[in-house]
């Protein structure tokens, strides 16, 4: 059985640095279902933000209940993304992709029919979350394998990450339109219809490698890593209810994560294949880029939840009004994404990521200052536009730096880790910023400001991490994978 790296080096999917080489038309058509899959998964993570009031009233729950459903969805994605990536070798990349789509679709329909919060969490958070964890790793692995020259691959990654950012930013607008025109349940039916269309489009997908059922799978590592992440994030969610429970869950989560890495080291010393190789954490450039990637999604989802909840719960805006305000962020991300390739030709990856953080932080400051001085909902638009531009400028460069820090044979592993880190950032953004907001709803203006200040401080950490990246960070893989 040839490995992923062997096929890329020796087979018809041979790697080339020829900037003129272009993928064939059939290969370019394969990008459509992959990009749509990333779009709908990102959309699912943000569209519920504008339904907070509608869902809480219809299901007789609270704002915190809806926050929990959103956070658990993002958390399940993060917790199972690496195991999902490992299963692609065992089951096949296309098979995992389609299975994930089917599970996601079932979860969307179950959510649409949910009679209460429990079924909503089962359908949206669990089924859709696990489905996403199965289908997203193949998106990035297949893109790496099918787009074999560096220029077309960078362009393909730009399309996919751009669609992810647009899905996350457009989620409130589309979700708001559907919720106001029909019902919040129709938004989940919309997701199921898009997923069905992707399943049809994926019939033309080709998997360059056959599945290998003998590929080892580290079940213990999967349980330890997933349980650790779940405990940490759920502990953060409990901070406004019981600090002792929160501290206990976070402590257990940290112990489980430490136990996971000890387990991985033991597996490697025994010559066995762990869930995640420790080699992935020995690359300083990749580590820094992963930090920036995590914080980018933390800021995007944190700002989306805080602004959406504040507009609906405090200002009394409905779903469509809230969604329309978020068109500013959507326009910013879309505009910056369209310019990403041109900017990458003129500036280093580090410069783009640093600039993105500076613009995003400026947007958060504007959100703080204008909202305090101006009661109109449009006071949010300038800040959201800046945040969209900043995030759109740096989402693709961060992915490029991470993926390019490793040789071809490690692309599957680093892709899974990269997606896990991004989704963990999304869940932390909703959990941390949302908890700061919800805990102080008795004094909403103060709690809104506190949540934004927390996000700004985290954004500063991302700016520092990006400044530490090598000045020549590029999209060219190193020979050894270590820098």
What are these regions (language model features)?
Residues 1-42, 57:
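Cytosolic juxtamembrane N-terminal segment immediately preceding the first transmembrane helix
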Residues 27-50, 63, 139, 182, ...:
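12-transmembrane solute porter fold
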Residues 34, 41, 70-73, 77, ...:
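Structural signature of transmembrane alpha-helices in multi-pass secondary transporters
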Residues 51-80, 119-121, 320-325:
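Extracellular/periplasmic helix-loop-helix junction of adjacent transmembrane segments
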Residues 89-220, 408:
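Helix-loop-helix hairpins in multi-pass membrane proteins, especially solute transporters
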Residues 180-293, 299, 317, 324-325, ...:
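Hydrophobic transmembrane-helix bundles of small-molecule transporters
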């Amino acid at each position: 059985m040839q490995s992923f790296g062997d096929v890329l080096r020796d087979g018809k999917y041979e790697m080339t640095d020829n900037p003129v080489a272009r993928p064939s038309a059939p290969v370019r058509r394969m990008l459509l279902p992959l990009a749509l899959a990333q779009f709908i998964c990102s959309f699912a993570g943000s569209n519920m933000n504008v339904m907070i009031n509608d869902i809480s009233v219809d299901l007789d729950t609270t704002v915190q209940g809806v926050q929990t459903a959103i956070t658990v969805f993002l958390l399940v994605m993060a917790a199972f993304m690496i195991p999902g990536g490992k299963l692609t070798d065992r089951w096949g990349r296309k098979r995992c992709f389609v299975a994930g789509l089917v599970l996601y679709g079932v979860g969307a329909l179950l959510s649409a029919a949910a009679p209460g919060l429990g079924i909503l969490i089962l359908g949206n958070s669990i089924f859709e979350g696990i489905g996403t964890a199965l289908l997203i790793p193949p998106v990035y692995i297949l893109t790496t394998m099918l787009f074999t020259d560096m220029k077309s691959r960078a362009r393909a990654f730009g399309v996919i990450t751009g669609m992810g950012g647009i899905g996350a930013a457009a989620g409130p607008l589309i979700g708001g339109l559907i919720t106001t025109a029909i019902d919040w349940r129709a938004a989940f039916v919309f997701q199921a219809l898009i997923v069905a269309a992707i399943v049809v489009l994926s019939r033309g997908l080709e998997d360059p490698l056959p599945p290998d059922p003998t590929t080892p799978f580290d079940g213990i590592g999967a349980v330890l890593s997933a349980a650790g992440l779940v405990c940490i994030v759920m502990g953060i969610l409990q901070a406004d209810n019981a600090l002792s429970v929160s501290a206990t869950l976070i402590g257990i989560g940290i112990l489980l994560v430490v136990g996971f890495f000890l387990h991985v080291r033991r597996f490697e010393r025994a010559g066995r294949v762990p869930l995640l190789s420790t080699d992935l954490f020995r690359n300083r450039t990749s580590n820094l880029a992963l930090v920036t990637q995590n914080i980018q999604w933390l800021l995007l989802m944190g700002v989306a939840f805080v602004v959406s909840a504040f507009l609906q719960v405090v200002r009394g805006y409905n779903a469509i009004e809230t969604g329309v305000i978020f068109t500013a962020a959507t326009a910013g991300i879309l505009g910056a994404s369209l310019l990403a390739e041109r900017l990458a030709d003129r500036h280093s990856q580090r410069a783009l990521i640093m600039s993105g953080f500076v613009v995003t932080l400026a947007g958060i400051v504007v959100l703080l200052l204008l909202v305090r001085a101006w009661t109109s909902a449009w006071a949010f638009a300038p800040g959201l536009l800046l945040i969209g531009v900043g995030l759109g400028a740096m989402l693709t460069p961060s992915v490029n730096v991470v993926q390019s820090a490793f040789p071809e044979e490690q692309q599957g592993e680093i892709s899974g880790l990269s997606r896990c880190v991004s989704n963990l950032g999304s869940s932390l953004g909703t959990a941390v910023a949302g908890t700061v907001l919800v805990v102080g709803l008795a004094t909403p203006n103060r709690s809104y400001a506190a949540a934004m200040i927390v996000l700004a401080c985290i954004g500063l950490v991302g700016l520092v991490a990006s400044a530490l990246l090598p000045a020549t960070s590029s999209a060219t893989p190193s020979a050894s994978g270590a820098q």
